[in-house]
């Protein structure tokens, strides 16, 4: 018989920077405690992104059930709010099967939505988005940013003119809903009250993390990232709108797209992937440190906890 809703064991959440070892540790924990894994990675959900998204191997997917891997195609909208709602539903279903849950991933808004809830924002409006993207091309990002400053100064303060996808999404929400993003966020939907989270973030010394990032990029290139990026470029980059699909605005692909267009040499593109990935890791660490109450823990300490207590 399934355990009652009020007596489920806690949900282990393992966040942290890219290349910090979250996925491997999540696998070890899941095998130890008999858990299924929820991937909190906004790129692994797409079928078309494999090497550059650092997906688990087919063998790992066979050994432990994973969720939110290969479930969407590029171009299908899937927001952090969508993830939170579906993740809560799947956690409930996993609990009903008397299984444990491990959440692993570094997508900051996915982890935040899962743990804290999310604002009930309107779904993507393709017509509005395409018009805003055209305005971005013709007017520039600063003009759109100043529009957001007038319409929702609080939301504008959380980003800048370089964050074009968040900028367009903010303006799209305002036009779709007729109200500010800030007002919608104030009516945030919390996670189910009977969920208990054990939220951790995996810590690595910066130099070690950066070495791992550089090595991961080299490994991705050796494993066929160039071929994967070329296939994506030939399939999806005919128009400006396709090129700027959220899924394709991913470190590792954008730099190689620039190489295909002759804007960088291959060596320059690889070095840029490493640099941009290090920058991304730094932003992840800053976000997780400032916005979420996570317990920062080294891998050896986490392994010891699992071995001794099993959560």
Swiss-Prot record:
Top-level division of the source organism's lineage: Bacteria
Entry binding sites for ATP: 16-23
Region: Interaction with substrate tRNA, residue numbers: 41-44, 165-169
GO biological process: tRNA modification
Keyword tags: ATP-binding, Magnesium, Nucleotide-binding, Transferase, tRNA processing
Residues bound to substrate: 18-23
Residues the UniProt record annotates as site (Interaction with substrate tRNA): 107, 129
Family: Belongs to the IPP transferase family.
Subunit structure: Monomer.
Function: Catalyzes the transfer of a dimethylallyl group onto the adenine at position 37 in tRNAs that read codons beginning with uridine, leading to the formation of N6-(dimethylallyl)adenosine (i(6)A).
Protein name: tRNA dimethylallyltransferase
Protein species of origin: Chlorobium chlorochromatii (strain CaD3)
Lineage: Bacteria, Pseudomonadati, Chlorobiota, Chlorobiia, Chlorobiales
